[in-house]
């Protein structure tokens, strides 16, 4: 879970939330001021939600200031109207603000009422949270629940008596292509790592909610890495490996998949193994984060400076050519001599 900041909504904002949830308010903008959540602005209903969406939301997005936006849909559930929760964290905003807003996001949802929120979007660019971005998000979320697919596959494995070992050493994945969505906190951490504003990310799978969650982004030196690896559960790690190679200073992102063998359940091992490739595809393609090396380990003790260096810069084994017979001295050479062994001329030894 994200670290909580102790910031809460003002009484005025709480009162406005209660009024807005089932009233004629289409949009609520919430900002942090003086360590409190306050009402930034609001907009009334004008047209159907799709018509209002871009016209009301986009003008409120400041290029250097994060904010939260709650946008009311026209659909309802048992608790009332359904809302979209947008977390806006532009690239040009200060890192301190980004982290503050990321850590307070859960509080905003709780104060408003999580049961009213149908969808949640995180964006750093306007196209991320525009109507087209929201529809793309809905389309991705409409895929079959990954965990259900996993359970079906697991059942098929049992029926067909497939007895393939599932472990860190096994390169064959029984489940192909499972994809748990990244939580907004995890997405923001990846963006910060790409900008080299943090140097370490630890992610976990929430097997019940079927999401990839952020564990923490504590500053990590190489000597700290072994202690970051849990001994009883799997994790995904991204580490900005700073080192020198052939006289150049390099900063290489290394992905580490830690799986402590059979201390984890079969289900956990299967899901971590199956979600790994889709997670990496997303990080490399959607976030354009270049990963220099992907490593799988069982024990954090493996993560030494020498180990990382050899993984990122594997030793090149030169091709061994057959020994070439040296050429003789230049100039006139004597006649060739044929040396025969004893008995080869028909003589006795």
Swiss-Prot record:
Keywords: Actin-binding, Cytoplasm, Cytoskeleton, Repeat. GO terms for cellular component: actin filament; cytoplasm; myofibril; perinuclear region of cytoplasm. Residues 4-139, 177-313 form the ADF-H domain. GO terms for biological process: actin filament depolymerization; barbed-end actin filament capping; positive regulation of neuron projection development; regulation of lamellipodium assembly. The keyword Disulfide bond does not apply. It comes from the Eukaryota. The keyword Repeat applies. GO terms for molecular function: actin filament binding; actin monomer binding. CDD domains: ADF_Twf-C_like, ADF_Twf-N_like. It is found in: Cytoplasm, Cytoskeleton; Cytoplasm, Perinuclear region. Pfam families: Cofilin_ADF. Residues 321-349 are annotated as: Disordered. Its main location: cytoplasm. InterPro entries: ADF-H, ADF-H/Gelsolin-like_dom_sf, Twinfilin. Interacts with G-actin; ADP-actin form and capping protein (CP). Actin-binding protein involved in motile and morphological processes. Inhibits actin polymerization, likely by sequestering G-actin. Belongs to the actin-binding proteins ADF family. Twinfilin subfamily. This is Twinfilin-2-A.
